[in-house]
């Protein structure tokens, strides 16, 4: 019973709670309904009111347009007030435009003050309300300006309306109410205008102007009219002038206005009067002083980021170019500001592409976000930047250097080498680079050598150092126009020699000692001095690279040859000291940049001297470097010795480098187990070669060998024409004969794998060698054979064209390499024709040339296009330098590219490229073909081995050496050496290194009857006993063994006659 009561009570309470909640929910729903109804009524009321107001505004504006309503200032004010209450930018666009036109029309009314909208500013009751209203109207004008595109016709009309509003009500100049008696009110009205401008600035007015200017000017052709640009610039300038050039407004003007791409360029083109306003207000002067104070420049740069900082830099440079007087007065601050801005940009310049970098057309890979909307304006920005290295600016900045007079010496005569070659030219926009009157500067002055005497802390030196820092910063920051900068800096023919003269005078003892001291000093002064050296090296290297031999050796543009000797000596010592003193081992940043700059200039001079000598004998050697010490350090793997060999091997005597090369090869042979030892013998590869098919059999059997097997011992067995094995054991001699024969055949121009240059004495891959089946595999095989000869120290008489040797060394990958430079080594006549085009003063298009090359290929005329569509592109004065380079590159690279790549691949499979980088092109030729010096008979006699009874005191041997020394010419001695060894040149390291050694053997019978030395033959030879008079026989040779077979002649005259005949006929083994 009690349990049922408890259940009913719980149910009752539950029902009561539910009832309360229902009542509460009903009340809330009623309240919500009432609130929603109120909101809807309010919304509908507001919509109705807005509609009524808009209708009223529309009726008013339509009436004013038709003339049915005469609008005065008060009616416009009231209607504007109503519109501004309900104003929405997107909905009231057309309405607002009509209102602005109405206001502007009122301002143009004649002699009716009550109509002028500005008259309300004079009403005590309405002044504050009017100011508030005009501020709002002008800001809405600004908001619309942000959205408009100047290149759209309709938008450009609206821009004119809104700009006119802003121009009209931010300056009292056009207010008719202030004319006459109202002039006394102008100060008060000016104050109101300043107040309006202040309000707009606080709201971000400069950002609006920046957007509109950028939209209209950041393109190849500006879309802003003269009037629009004038209005925009006037509006931008007003707050600055009104605030009496306060730091805050100067900063805003620089960040938002002067950072607009090529603004000054467009002003000078469209509205030159605005530039006069800049000048009259001294703006450039104020900009430079502001940016030079404390951290203002870095603050502005941080706000702008890289792309826009570059735009500001371009505009400042352009202003500096236009205002020469201010530039002279504020040169120190101008240079300092530009350096700081370039330094800021440089922090974000990257050397390579990565996930964090973006491509910039002037800065290259850039680690900040790049505004690609500015790309169209980059050509104009580049033109602005070019003023920095233009003649006008360089003359101003380097005035102290250029004012220096170089002492003249009329009696100096300069020996000029007779060989001819060319140097690279640079296809850059400076069209008249090669037509300058250079000749006057270099040919008559004293040689400039380090003399010292100028204090490095003097104002003059500090100024020049700062300028050099600026240009060096430009070179490392503006990476994509670096060549333009270098061309500009080298345009004045006397800048570089005078800068060198300036460097020579620095410090108490002259340049070298001072700069070496700077290397060990980490001070700001040292860095600036080294920047001067870097700039000099970069510019000089660029100049010498683009000059040809006539300009360097005969006209001696900028530098005399003796000065190049002095400079190269300075550079050689400087680089050597940097390496040997350990400064390069952990170098980075500025030190590494310094080294690459000085080393690059040094190597350009060295390579030019290798092609055509201007320096004295042994000029490049370091007398204080002992080769034995260097070799010891190389054995210990000391870093400085390795770097020396990598960067300046030329300081080591050539013979020592050849010894080093041979040591490297020997060590590799030992490492690969290719050398006979007491415990092991090297693996031997045996091949059988038919004499009638020597090339084919050699190719088939050797091309499949592994790299190590090719480097190892190869034994050759010859099979004669009858298919019978030839007698004899190959102890390197037969392989030498095989190798020499292979090389002789493949390099024979008749085979058409290689052909001779125009001079007929040098070889390079034949462009038509593709007629051979598997010709690329053949070239790779030939490369291996030549590599094997060099590897084994076998000299072969194969004279290569200089340009081909440069490619074998990898020089063509250098940024300083030019095909034109090497062209004479291929075809001197062709080179003369091309350089005559370069020097042609008339209109080159009259010659009817195109960017193509016509060639007779096996009876058919083939047209090779140098660029895509080249046969339809005429050669003009603008592209003729490019044409010369393209033509040279085609002849020496493109045309034989595949053959060269295959040959080099084969050669490098035997000879590593780093082994031969220590040699120049002529030195590599000597490594391949032996020394081109006179044959040293004493050395040959000392290292000759005698057989068959001959000995050093034998009568025939004495006659032989006497004939060679006194009766034979140099040419005949070379023929004699070729007769015995197959090569007319002696080994590089002397005859001690000839393998097999030079040998002379006494023979009694013909070669086909010769069975070698016997006891009887040796005794007869030793005691000069003859079976019969051998006067009818000729001397013969076995070149595979470097063996001269000499009959035991009875008279010296017979020996002379027979030997001369034999070597002239080059009979050798064949005449036996």
Curated annotation (Swiss-Prot):
It comes from the Eukaryota. Its main location: other. InterPro entries: E3A/B/C-like, HECT_dom, Hect_E3_ubiquitin_ligase, IQ_motif_EF-hand-BS. Residues 706-1072 form the HECT domain. The keyword Transferase applies. It is found in: Postsynaptic density. PROSITE patterns: HECT, IQ. One of its GO terms (molecular function) is ubiquitin protein ligase activity. GO terms for cellular component: postsynaptic density. One of its GO terms (biological process) is protein polyubiquitination. The keyword Cell membrane does not apply. Keywords: Synapse, Transferase, Ubl conjugation pathway. The active site is at 1040 (glycyl thioester intermediate). Residues 29-58 form the IQ domain. Pfam families: HECT (PF00632), IQ (PF00612). It catalyses: S-ubiquitinyl-[E2 ubiquitin-conjugating enzyme]-L-cysteine + [acceptor protein]-L-lysine = [E2 ubiquitin-conjugating enzyme]-L-cysteine + N(6)-ubiquitinyl-[acceptor protein]-L-lysine. Pathway: Protein modification; protein ubiquitination. Its EC number is 2.3.2.26. SMART domains: HECTc (SM00119), IQ (SM00015). E3 ubiquitin-protein ligase which accepts ubiquitin from an E2 ubiquitin-conjugating enzyme in the form of a thioester and then directly transfers the ubiquitin to targeted substrates. This is Ubiquitin-protein ligase E3B. It comes from Xenopus tropicalis (Western clawed frog). The gene is ube3b.
């Amino acid at each position: 019973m009690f349990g049922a009561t408890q259940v009913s009570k719980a149910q009752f309470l539950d029902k009561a709670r539910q009832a309360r909640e229902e009542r509460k929910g009903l009340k809330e729903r009623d309240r919500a309904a009432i609130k929603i109804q109120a909101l809807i009524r309010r919304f509908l009321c507001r919509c109705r009111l807005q509609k009524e107001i808009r209708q009223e505004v529309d009726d008013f504006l339509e009436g004013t347009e038709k003339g049915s309503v005469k609008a005065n200032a008060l009616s416009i004010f009231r209607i504007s007030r109503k519109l501004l209450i309900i104003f929405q930018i997107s909905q009231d666009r057309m309405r607002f435009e009509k209102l602005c036109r109405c206001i502007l029309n009122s301002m143009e009314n004649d002699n009716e003050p009550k109509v002028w909208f500005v008259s309300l500013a004079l009403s005590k009751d309405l002044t504050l309300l009017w100011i508030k209203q005009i501020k709002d109207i002008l800001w809405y004008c600004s908001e619309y300006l942000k959205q408009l595109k100047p290149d759209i016709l309709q938008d450009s009309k609206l821009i004119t309306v809104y700009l006119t509003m802003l121009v009209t009500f931010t300056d009292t100049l056009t207010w008719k109410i202030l004319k006459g008696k109202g002039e006394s009110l102008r100060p008060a009205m000016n104050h109101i205008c300043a107040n309006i401008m202040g309000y707009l600035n606080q709201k971000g007015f400069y950002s609006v102007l920046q957007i509109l200017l950028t939209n209209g000017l950041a393109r190849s052709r500006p879309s802003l009219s003269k009037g629009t640009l004038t209005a925009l610039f006037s509006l931008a300038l007003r707050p600055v002038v009104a605030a009496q050039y306060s730091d805050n407004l100067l900063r805003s003007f620089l960040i938002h206005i002067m950072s607009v791409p090529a603004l000054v360029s467009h002003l000078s083109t469209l509205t030159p009067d605005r530039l006069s306003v800049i000048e009259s207000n001294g703006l450039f002067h104020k900009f430079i002083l502001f940016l030079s104070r404390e951290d203002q420049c870095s603050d502005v740069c941080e706000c702008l980021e890289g792309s826009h900082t570059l735009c500001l830099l371009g505009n400042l440079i352009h202003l500096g170019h236009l205002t020469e007087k201010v530039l002279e007065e504020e040169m120190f601050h101008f240079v300092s500001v530009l350096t700081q801005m370039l330094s800021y940009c440089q922090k974000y310049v990257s050397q390579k592409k990565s996930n964090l970098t973006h491509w910039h057309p002037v800065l290259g890979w850039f680690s900040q976000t790049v505004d690609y909307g500015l790309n169209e304006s980059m050509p104009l920005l580049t033109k602005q930047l070019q003023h920095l290295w233009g003649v006008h600016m360089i003359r101003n900045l380097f005035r102290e250097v250029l004012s220096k007079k170089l002492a003249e010496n009329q009696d100096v005569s300069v020996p000029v080498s007779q060989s001819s070659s060319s140097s690279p030219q640079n296809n850059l926009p400076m069209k008249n680079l090669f037509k300058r009157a250079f000749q006057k500067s270099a040919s008559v002055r004293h040689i400039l050598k380090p003399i010292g005497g100028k204090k490095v802390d003097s104002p003059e030196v500090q100024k020049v150092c700062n300028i050099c820092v600026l240009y060096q910063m430009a070179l490392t920051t503006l990476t994509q126009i670096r060549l333009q900068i270098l061309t500009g800096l080298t345009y004045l023919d006397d800048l570089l020699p005078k800068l060198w003269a300036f460097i020579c005078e620095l410090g108490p003892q002259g340049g070298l000692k001072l700069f070496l001291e700077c290397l060990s000093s980490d001070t700001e002064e040292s860095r600036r001095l080294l920047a001067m050296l870097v700039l000099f090296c970069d510019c000089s290297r660029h100049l010498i690279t683009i000059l040809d031999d006539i300009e360097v050796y005969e006209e001696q543009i900028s530098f005399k040859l003796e000065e190049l000797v002095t400079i190269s000596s300075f550079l050689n010592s400087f680089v050597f000291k940097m390496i040997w003193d350990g400064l390069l081992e952990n170098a980075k940043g500025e030190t590494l940049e310094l080294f690459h700059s000085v080393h690059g200039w040094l190597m350009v001079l060295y390579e030019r001297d290798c092609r055509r000598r201007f320096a004295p004998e042994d000029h490049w050697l370091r007398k204080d470097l002992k080769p034995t010490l260097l070799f010891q350090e190389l054995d210990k793997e000391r870093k400085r010795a390795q770097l020396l060999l990598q960067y300046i091997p030329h300081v080591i005597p050539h013979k020592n480098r050849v010894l080093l090369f041979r040591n490297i090869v020997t060590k590799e042979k030992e490492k690969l187990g290719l050398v006979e030892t007491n415990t092991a013998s090297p693996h031997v590869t045996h091949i059988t070669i038919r004499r009638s098919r020597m090339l084919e059999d050699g190719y088939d059997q050797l091309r499949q060998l592994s790299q190590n097997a090719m480097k190892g011992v190869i034994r050759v067995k010859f099979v004669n024409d009858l298919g019978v094995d030839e007698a004899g054991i190959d102890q390197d001699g037969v392989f030498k004969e095989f190798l020499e024969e292979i090389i002789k055949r493949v390099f024979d121009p008749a085979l058409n794998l290689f052909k001779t240059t125009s001079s007929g004495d040098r070889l390079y891959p034949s462009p038509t060698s593709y007629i051979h089946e598997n010709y690329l595999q053949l070239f790779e095989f030939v490369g291996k054979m030549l590599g094997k000869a060099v590897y084994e120290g076998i000299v072969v008489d194969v004279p290569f064209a200089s340009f081909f040797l440069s490619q074998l060394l990898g020089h063509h990958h250098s940024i300083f390499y030019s095909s034109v430079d090497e062209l004479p080594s291929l075809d001197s006549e062709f080179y003369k024709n091309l350089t005559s085009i370069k020097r042609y003063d008339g209109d080159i298009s009259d010659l009817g040339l195109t960017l193509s090359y016509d060639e007779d290929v096996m009876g058919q005329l083939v047209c090779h296009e140098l660029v895509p569509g080249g046969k339809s592109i005429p050669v003009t004065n603008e592209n003729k330098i490019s044409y010369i380079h393209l033509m040279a590159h085609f002849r020496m690279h493109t045309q034989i590219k595949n053959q060269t790549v295959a040959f080099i691949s084969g050669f490098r499979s035997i000879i590593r490229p780093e082994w031969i980088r220590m040699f120049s092109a002529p030195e590599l030729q000597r490594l391949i073909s032996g020394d081109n010096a006179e044959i040293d008979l004493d050395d040959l006699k000392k290292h000759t081995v005698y057989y068959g009874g001959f000995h050093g005191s034998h009568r025939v041997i004495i006659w032989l050496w006497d004939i060679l020394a006194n009766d034979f010419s140099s040419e005949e001695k070379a023929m004699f050496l070729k007769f015995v060894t197959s090569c007319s040149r002696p080994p590089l390291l002397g005859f001690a290194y000839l393998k097999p050694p030079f040998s002379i053997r006494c023979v009694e019978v013909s070669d086909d009857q010769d069975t070698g030395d016997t006891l009887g033959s040796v005794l007869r030879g030793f005691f000069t006993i003859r079976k019969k008079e051998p006067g009818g026989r000729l001397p013969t040779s076995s070149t595979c063994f470097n063996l001269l077979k000499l009959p035991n002649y009875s008279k010296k005259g017979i020996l002379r006659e027979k030997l001369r005949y034999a070597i002239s006929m080059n009979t050798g083994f064949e005449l036996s």
